[in-house]
UniProtKB/Swiss-Prot annotation:
One of its GO terms (molecular function) is structural constituent of ribosome. GO terms for biological process: cytoplasmic translation. PROSITE patterns: RIBOSOMAL_L6_1. The keyword Ribosomal protein applies. The keyword Ribosomal protein applies. Belongs to the universal ribosomal protein uL6 family. This is Large ribosomal subunit protein uL6. PANTHER family: 60S/50S RIBOSOMAL PROTEIN L6/L9, LARGE RIBOSOMAL SUBUNIT PROTEIN UL6M. The gene is rplF. Keywords: Ribonucleoprotein, Ribosomal protein, RNA-binding, rRNA-binding. One of its GO terms (cellular component) is cytosolic large ribosomal subunit. InterPro entries: Ribosomal_uL6-like, Ribosomal_uL6-like_a/b-dom_sf, Ribosomal_uL6_a/b-dom, Ribosomal_uL6_bac-type, Ribosomal_uL6_CS.
Length: 180
């Protein structure tokens, strides 16, 4: 039995869950999410809990059991609380500004980078060096944060670049040089 898959998912009062055929739809105060479920996985609602079970007991179905339980749990949490990732820009002259539905980055290059904010994602700027990516879909929030970080990955000598707030950059010592 999957350690993650066997755990029930508690449904909050503000969340409405609908299961039809191989689709599960979760609706809450922040929005609505849907997910297609593999036919080898059964999902049912009992006593205000979502139960995820396997139809078969082969290797692939055992792998899907925990996966779909986690996906459904993230859907329920996303429509009720939402997800957030924070990024920080380090470096002299490095900054970001928002104009409409786009972010413009100055990252030490001769041109600005433009990043168009995808639908369903909210971005808050705190000053011009802090970025908060928010949304109801955990996967999309993480993907957008990773795309923004990839514009200028932190380098190990001075730590210049875009990093997650909880990320620790492994630093290297610079050249020592030979004295004459």
């Amino acid at each position: 039995m999957s350690r993650i898959g066997k755990l029930p998912i508690k449904i909050a009062d503000s969340v409405k869950v609908d299961i039809k055929d191989n689709f599960i739809t979760v609706e809450g105060k922040r929005g609505k999410l849907s997910q297609e479920i593999n036919s080898s996985i059964r999902v049912k609602i009992e006593d205000n809990n979502i139960i995820v079970e396997r139809a078969f007991n082969n290797k692939q179905t055992r792998a899907f059991h925990g996966l779909y339980r986690s996906l459904i749990f993230n859907m329920v949490k996303g429509v009720s609380d939402g997800f957030s990732k924070s990024l920080t820009i380090n470096g002299i002259g490095y900054r970001v500004e928002q104009q409409g539905n786009s972010l413009f980055f100055n990252l030490g290059y001769s041109t600005q980078f433009e990043y168009v904010i995808p639908e369903g994602i909210n971005i808050r700027l705190d000053g011009n060096t802090k970025i908060a990516v928010e949304g109801i879909d955990k996967c999309r929030v993480g993907q957008v944060a990773a795309e923004i970080r990839s514009l200028k990955v932190p380098e190990p000598y001075k730590g210049k670049g875009i990093k997650y707030d909880n990320e620790v950059i492994r630093r290297k010592v610079g050249k020592s040089g030979v004295k004459k």
